[in-house]
């Protein structure tokens, strides 16, 4: 197994009850020693290396900035993270195990799996990794990427032109977002559209979840991380397998980790 050079980027925004330092500490404990935070104005300042935005970029453009930074790092693998998560200490080793048996049709591997992605008809899905079939993905909290795929994402026509879901916003709001790009959000939605519809790839999730969403408030308004906004089965908790115990399907040699 080759040593994998990582670039981990964290998108941070102002919160009444910030969790950023908890996120950084968890990443460090898992072995990601140098995450870089991309911080919106008035955000909590952590101990991590930080790029401070002088003006507000908003959810979408701050994430794009972070993703492009990671792509310029020369890393073998990239992880894009939100500022209100925890990860199990074995998460990096698990992610590298998957990277070395990377599914050919994968858009990304999410270390975070919300409740409704871990059950089917009310019953727990088997432990392992599997693609999710959905029109719109939910929760881009902690995503592992091959650089070649992430580069396709950020350079895609949909990413360049993304304003939001036209069916969900009126003409007035659409025009407002065009004038003020910092209002553009729906990160998880656009990633799902590009991966599923445009690139015809799949989004992979792990069960149990290696990551938990711990927010007590939303940076864009809304409720705390409960119900479908949190993981139901968390690795290493309540008798669930640790990340090192989650089965990873073996791929044929030509399907292994290739940049």
Predicted region positions:
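An acidic/histidine-cluster motif and surrounding catalytic segment
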Residues: 1-81, 85-259
């Amino acid at each position: 197994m080759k040593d994998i050079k990582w670039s981990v980027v964290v998108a941070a925004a102002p919160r009444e009850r910030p969790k950023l330092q908890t996120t950084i500490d968890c990443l460090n404990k898992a072995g990601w020693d140098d995450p870089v935070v991309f911080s919106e104005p008035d955000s909590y300042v952590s101990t991590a290396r930080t790029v401070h935005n002088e003006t507000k970029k908003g959810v979408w453009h701050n994430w794009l900035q972070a993703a492009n930074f990671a792509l310029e790092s020369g890393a073998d693998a990239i992880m894009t993270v939100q500022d209100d998560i925890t990860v199990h200490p074995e998460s990096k080793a698990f992610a590298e195990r998957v990277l070395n048996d990377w599914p050919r049709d994968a858009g990304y591997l999410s270390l975070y799996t919300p409740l409704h992605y871990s059950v089917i008809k009310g019953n727990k899905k088997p432990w392992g990794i599997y693609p999710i079939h959905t029109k719109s993905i939910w929760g881009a909290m902690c995503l592992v990427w091959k650089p070649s795929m992430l580069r396709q994402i950020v350079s895609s026509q949909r990413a360049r032109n993304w304003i939001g879901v036209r069916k969900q916003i009126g003409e007035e709001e659409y025009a407002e977002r065009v004038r003020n790009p910092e209002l553009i959000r729906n990160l998880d939605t656009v990633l799902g559209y590009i991966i599923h519809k445009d690139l015809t790839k799949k989004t992979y999730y792990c069960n149990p979840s290696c990551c938990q969403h711990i927010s007590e408030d939303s940076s864009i308004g809304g409720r705390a991380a409960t119900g479908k906004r949190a993981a139901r089965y968390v690795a290493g908790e309540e008798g669930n397998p640790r990340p090192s115990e989650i089965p990873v399907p073996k791929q044929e040699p030509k399907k292994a980790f290739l940049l």
